[in-house]
């Protein structure tokens, strides 16, 4: 698709990922989940994951495919798509979003929240693959609306605290750009 014709929006549900060219704009809504965006500036190829947990916690069974619900497998699946397009992981730029605490005041003292674990896992995975992280918006309280313009490599993030007005997030969802 020619980007001059306009971009096509795709919305990721939890456990989904997408890799596409400049003709796409990828959106998602995150709470404690985390999204990793990858962008290759020269080819304007980009991808986004929306994972729920850092890893499966047990080995995959023989013949079992990669599962986008898990950060390690979601990143591996995205990197395989990039490699099929001739892009090596270290040629990409990464940004990380999400990991919010959705239930402040309901945590045990000293216990790491799932959002915190997800964000730390994303950082570690990208470091392991040698992919530079050029931006992040992690942790805090509440959810985030994320919009990734693959053509430009720009990612917009709007964080809304629990119980707050969601006006800014609603505007982003309707296509009102910052």
Locate predicted features.
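Short acidic-hydrophobic catalytic motif
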Residues: 1-33, 43, 49-59, 67-91, ...
């Amino acid at each position: 698709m020619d980007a001059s014709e306009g971009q096509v929006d795709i919305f990721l549900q939890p456990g989904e990922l997408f890799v596409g060219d400049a003709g796409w704009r990828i959106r998602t809504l995150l709470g404690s989940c985390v999204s990793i965006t990858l962008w290759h500036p020269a080819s304007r190829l980009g991808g986004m994951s929306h994972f729920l947990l850092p890893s499966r916690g047990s080995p995959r069974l023989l013949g079992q495919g990669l599962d986008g619900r898990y950060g390690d497998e979601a990143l591996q699946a995205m990197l395989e798509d990039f490699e099929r397009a001739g892009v090596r992981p270290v040629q990409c730029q990464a940004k990380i979003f999400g990991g919010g605490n959705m239930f402040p005041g309901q945590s045990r003292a000293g216990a790491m929240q799932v959002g915190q674990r997800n964000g730390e896992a994303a950082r570690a995975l990208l470091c392991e693959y040698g992919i530079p992280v050029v931006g992040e918006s992690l942790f805090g309280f509440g959810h985030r609306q994320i919009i990734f313009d693959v053509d430009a490599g720009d990612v917009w993030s709007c964080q809304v605290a629990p119980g707050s007005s969601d006006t800014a997030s609603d505007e982003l969802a309707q296509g009102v750009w910052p």
